[in-house]
Amino acid sequence: MSSRNDWPLIPGTVIAHSSAATGKYIGSPGLAILPDGSYVAAHDHFGPGSSEHGISETWIYRSTDRGTSWSPSCQIDGAFWSNLFVHRGALFLFGTSRHYGYAVIRRSDDGGLTWTTPTDSKTGLLTNTPEYHCAPMPVVEHKGYLYRAFEHRSPGTGWGTNFTSGVFRAKLGADLLDARSWE
């Protein structure tokens, strides 16, 4: 783990570093503050040395001292382009299963140490076809709903023209791991 002194030209605290020589680059950064005041950060790996096109990986870190120091909590396989958010006391990670994968959501009830696994439409697998794309965009609460932007692509129609933008939304009281809760 890095400390402030390892990177004197960077303000704040470096949470994670991946040498360019590995071909694994840090992307999709995210941050959430838990009800107990702990901070949780996330990132995925992309690049030629990564597994973004197969079983992608997202790393979760936790700080209990307002970001001064960080400890790795876990690695989540099958999570990419994901964002963290807190809803009704639980921590969620919402993104894709891999580069152009399925839309998936996971829940942690212990501050990011363990996570649900999206294996079907009741446990966080929100789409039955892949080709979803997104970034670690915020989940927005408005007028009784949660909203999350996504894109879907249709391969073979040409770069740029093969993407359509959309929004997932769910009622505030819904089970967010149930695909039927999302419109």
Outline where the language-model segments fall.
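Beta-rich carbohydrate-recognition and catalytic domains
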Residues: M1-S28, A32-W81, F85-A135, V140-E183
